[in-house]
Amino acid sequence: MSLVIQPSLFGSLGELGVAQLGAAVERRPLSDGAWIDLRPGFITAADELFDVLAASVPWHEERMRMYDTTVRVPRLLAGYTQAETLPHPVLDEARCALSAHYAAELGEPFVSVGLCLYRDGSDSVAWHGDRIARESTGDTMVAIVSLGATRAFGLRPKSGGPGLRLQVGHGDLLVMGGSCQRTWLHGVPKVASCLGARISIQFRPHWGDQLRTSTAGGPDGKAQ
């Protein structure tokens, strides 16, 4: 698969790896007990990881039911359960680092890994709140690592009111926690022009087998 990666001043410098979390993580409280954490540059020298994932992951297209017709999901998808080997050891390092950092709050490790490939600006994901790995009244965390082109990541409260739009770049980490999946919606909108492809890597706790049927955005959730 031939894809264009957005040029990055830092993505090809240094050694591919996982940066420290700790004090480098910025928490932004939202309403209704929701919050997001941001850690720019969590994956260092990320160009290599983008290239490996784009070429080696078994990407597939899915379709979903919308009213009385079936439509193409506007992005390519892949998923790995706890029992499956991840496509690059840096993903194992990232999962371990996230599990250690959020152990006290989450109470369990991150397990499943979902991936989305946004081939260009016409690929997107609609407003939604994830149902994967949470109950109707329970909370969970979703940790998202972005590779490739910088894309807008929008969040807005379900109850109405102002939201926010973040520009998430190459190697950046965004974590949604607290009540975020119940009380807020998030999405990646289409853009008229885009400098390249984007890969989103989502780390979630338990229920990894659900990934097989829910990454397309069915009743159990969507992937970012």
Q: Which ranges hold each PLM region?
A:
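Non-heme Fe(II) oxygenase metal-center motifs and adjacent flexible, charged/small-residue loops
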Residues: 1-224
